[in-house]
Amino acid sequence: NIYYTAPGASTAAIGVNIDRQNYKFSAKKTDAEKTSTKKALLNKDFRQSINFAIDRTAYQSQVNGKDGAALAIRNLFVPSDFVSAGDKTFGDLVTEKMSTYGDEWSGVNFADGQDGLYNPEKAKAEFAKAKEALQGEGVQFPIHLDLPVDQSSKLNVAQAQSLKQTIEKSLGSENVVIDINQLSSDDMQNATLNAANAAAEDWDISNGVVWGPDYQDPSTYLDIFKTTSSENTKTFMGYDDPNNAAAAQVGLKDYDALLDSAASETTDLNARYDRYAQAQAWLEDSSLVIPLTVGNGAAPVI
């Protein structure tokens, strides 16, 4: 029999590079392709289309097998049951907030352990909105997204291939192409986590970003995306200047304000968690960080 360890608290996600400067490892052939990709990644509807296009069950099946895949899926960056306010989990609080962000979030189940985000029809609808706006900006299609992967890891390569397959199937390869760049372990690290600065980050989307909590408060997850958290914004979003123009364009100063409001509530835990749920809802709607799975645990044991 196969058993599975308990899901861990860390979260694995896709980072979105909103201000890419480095193209050493890239399938892009022209400046027009680079510009088109950057404009697309700055468009929230486009990012949401990617979020809804990913079959997380297929993705995690590469590691856990089909039967154990769902156990590892995470739909919010903060685990849905990380804290509670009264009889409501953190995920319940976020669900209440999401209704204010648009019909695309209607009916989405944000609980851990099931794929609540995968919805090809929603993906197509969000992409259609994005394409209309982007064509008005002179964007060329298909949008090419560079996804780096460590070629020495068969599991990582398989997961990258799964992302490519499901995103292109959901959105159409005439619209979006995932270009998998298989790199040596050293090149992979230097292009992502160990990049000297944001300008050295060499990717459009990266599924190699993981974060775990240091204490039992939602801020331990959410504060890493404050515009002043330069080391983390470098790794997750491709910028490290709090005054970065792309960060301002996608509204991250609004996110800062939500976090500041939550942090200021120090006497009423329920109210504090409710405010952090508002920040998590903003982050989820933005699709600047796309949750995939737990970063540890939920592993098969024979």
Q: Where would I find each of the regions flagged by the language model?
A:
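Ligand-binding clamshell of periplasmic/extracellular solute-binding protein-like
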Residues: 1, 6-12, 203-221, 292-295
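Short helices/loops that flank or line small-molecule/ion binding pockets
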Residues: 1, 45, 161-169, 186-203
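Extracellular/periplasmic solute-recognition and catalytic clefts
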Residues: 1-27, 57, 62-66, 70
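Short, well-ordered beta-strand elements
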Residues: 12, 141-152, 178-180, 204
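Short helix-loop capping/hinge motifs at secondary-structure junctions, enriched
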Residues: 20-46
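Extracytoplasmic/peripheral linker and loop segments enriched in polar/acidic and small residues
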Residues: 39-42, 47-48, 52, 56, ...
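Append "and occasionally in soluble cytosolic enzymes with long acidic Gly/Pro-rich linkers
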Residues: 40-170
